[in-house]
Amino acid sequence: MDNNKSNHNSKINSFKGHKVLVIGDTHDSPNIPKDRFLWIGKHIKKIKPDYVVHIGDFSSFDSLSYFQANDTQQGKLKDAFMVDILSMRTALALINKGMGNVQVPKHITLGNHEQRVHKFEEKIPEIEGMMKDQLYQSFHSSNWTVSEYGSIFFVSGVGFTHVPKNIMGKEYGGRNAEISIANDCLHDLVFGHTHKDRDWKAPKIGDKQFVRIVNVGCALPMNHVERYAKLNMTGWSYGIVELSIWDNHIQEKNFVSMDRLEREYGKN
């Protein structure tokens, strides 16, 4: 018997890492196709990760957008809040449908678009808690746990958040956001928000010391650009991300495009 082969197999069987499927910003809304949520659920069923993490901005909540005032022409065309909530619940149900009987812990790190619910309620004290209750109950009833916008959720030493904030309480951004985050962060971090798939590994002084920052892109329909970004530079990345984590670091990363998800699951 090959002892080296036996030892190798023993190491594989005793692997204590975690496989995490990360879903980037999905920006669900009543007018955007929802079949992608079913595809994502089917992919979860296929690969059976240890965790599923949605990086936030599950829904756009354009009904609460403060960029279009209610007394403007565009503002008058906005959907009601409950229309957005019912749309989100349909999307959540499609993920569960695709997963079938596979049971995987699911967590969402709320994004700035979910934060719109908080900001709207703050202006109307009489309805405090009512809209947030609709938001949180939608996730809890579909078996998702939730962390607040700006907080960091950890899996095996790796942090997950919609977008990290700097010392001034502002979101990291710009052309070199990942580099800036790596300079300031003490652990590997996974985030979204910019809709761009980027991966930066920064070496640190010391034996085997480094920080890896992964931006997961977005999970919108392929080549869809949100209305607010029509005239902006985009270069968005459309897909979901598989991560393998051990030794408190992201060791492997695989980006699965929305095109591939559609080819594999779209006609099943």
For the regions a language model picked out, list residue spans one by one:
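Hydrophobic/aromatic residues located in beta-strands of well-ordered beta-sheets
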Residues: 52, 106-108, 213
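Active-site neighborhood of divalent metal-dependent phosphoester bond hydrolases
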Residues: 64-149
